[in-house]
Amino acid sequence: MIARSPSLEFLLIIRCTGARRPRINSFTLTTIAVDNHSPDPSIEELVIESAPHLQTLIHLDHNHDLHIAALSVPKLETLGCTNSTRLVFGSTDIRHHQGPCIRGLATAACKIKCLVLGMATLNLHMVIELMTNFPCLEKLYIQCQKSWKNNLWRRKYRGLITSTCFDIHLKTIVLDYYRGTKSDIDFVTFFVLNARVLERMKLLVKRNDDKFVAIHRHRLQLMNRASHGAHINFRLKDSDVCISNMYNFCIQENILNL
């Protein structure tokens, strides 16, 4: 099908049954998004043998495992994955157990500028581990199902923060969604107090009345933010419709350019 579509740029695979291990070779594709949720046997492995113009690769499903082997994707800049994703860039294996875990880096992984994470729990340790391995990362989008039990960081990451080997280059952070728990507050304040070039942070919430916003602007220490020009906003979370949570999130944030 792809070979017969020489102008195809965007490929959205949803509940595709029958083909468990499709292989892709395409000179024109710029975006691939996969939702392999299905009651019937669906895609288990996606092999991208060659996609020289691929810029965006996203796995949308939280609940069904998908092994993605990206063998040649030299222009890839936007990567989306969930707890059910296992990624291989060339010889670099990126595994997801309860969250992201990096095993070394390939050249393609080093060029990632935008990371979209579908996490079962909002876990600061896992996010920091990813950041230390993506040196060009500028945009971070996170959708989480619940808060992690503990995101304390001041003692644990004191040495890392002051290290010359670690610098946060993030300019954009979007969190879906912010519940206002102690764990959420600790997660967000890590970036508020340490992201020196941050330009925009959006926290999706289920209430943004004046009282809630005032309380949490104080708890998040926004007056002490490392980037004085950063715009930090609380936005009401939209209702989930359509294909999947990750899909809606990517559409709303213009990550998938349909």
Place the predicted regions along the sequence by residue.
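Leucine-rich repeat
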Residues: 1-129, 138, 142-160, 176, ...
